[in-house]
Design a protein with these regions (language model features):
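Short gly/ser-rich loop at a beta-strand->alpha-helix junction or flexible surface loop bordering the NTP-binding
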Residues: 17-104
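Bulky hydrophobic/aromatic packing residues
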Residues: 15, 81, 185-188
Length: 237
């Protein structure tokens, strides 16, 4: 509503007719959302990102939810986009969690129809890598492992070294491999990931499982070259 005065927008927003999503971007509240006076992000995210003229994909727990592996419905909505960061006020819309990377791995995105058009989200393998790499946005590695446990039946890392690994870090692959191997006992998937990793890089160095704790005196996992400096516990599904 670019031609509306701010006073008019405030009035119809307070009446529950429109919902303020972003500075200058409002969504008309459909009748079936009128009681809550808000609209879920999946309803407007594609239109919002078009308005911002930025590429995106639905990521982390919300992508996992689309894959049927969220365990619990996420309280926030994670959107992956590219730098530079958008100036989004948390007070304007605190349901959106913005995560940024250098480029969007379009070859590893899936699409589906929503109420208002088409939305884009990460495929299972990219989702798995993202929830490990950006675990600070979802509550840590134990939460990531719980999601991975539900996602394993959809994971297929054959050929990942050709292109997918270029969108993440070696450390992320190591941590994901360790979790699949030692925490989730998903040996077949872990073996495939390991073969892809060793074909991608000839050698890799030891890293801590988490950067939030010291690695002194931590046990070593020789296969994935991990300092096991934290305990990962998955929730019961």
């Amino acid at each position: 509503f670019p031609t509306r005065r701010s006073s008019d927008l405030f009035r119809i927003s307070s009446q529950g007719i429109i919902y303020p999503v972003y500075k200058g971007f409002y969504v008309i509240i459909p009748p079936h959302y009128a009681a809550k006076r808000m609209v879920p992000p999946i309803y407007y995210i594609d239109q919002l990102m078009s308005y911002l003229n930025k590429p995106y994909y639905i990521s982390l727990l919300n992508a996992a939810e689309i894959h049927g592996a969220a365990h619990q419905r996420p309280q926030k909505f994670s959107v992956m986009s590219v730098f530079p960061k958008s100036s989004v006020s948390q007070s304007k819309n605190n349901t959106l969690v913005w995560v940024y990377r250098k480029e969007i791995p379009t070859d590893f995105l899936l699409s589906k129809n929503s109420e208002t058009g088409v939305i884009y989200y990460s495929n299972a393998e990219l989702t798995a890598l993202d929830i490990v790499q950006y675990e600070q946005y979802i509550g840590g590695l134990s939460r990531a492992s719980t999601i991975l446990e539900e996602l394993t039946e959809k994971l297929d890392f054959r050929g990942a070294s050709n292109k997918l690994f270029g969108y993440t870090s070696i450390a992320t692959i190591q941590r994901l491999g360790y979790i699949l191997d030692e925490v989730l006992n998903a040996a077949e998937i872990a073996d495939t990931l390991y073969m892809e990793l060793t074909s991608y890089v000839k050698r890799f160095k030891y890293i801590p499982l988490t950067i939030n704790k010291p690695k002194d005196c931590a046990e070593r996992n020789n296969r994935w070259k991990i300092f096991v400096n934290t305990i990962i516990e998955t929730d019961e599904i």
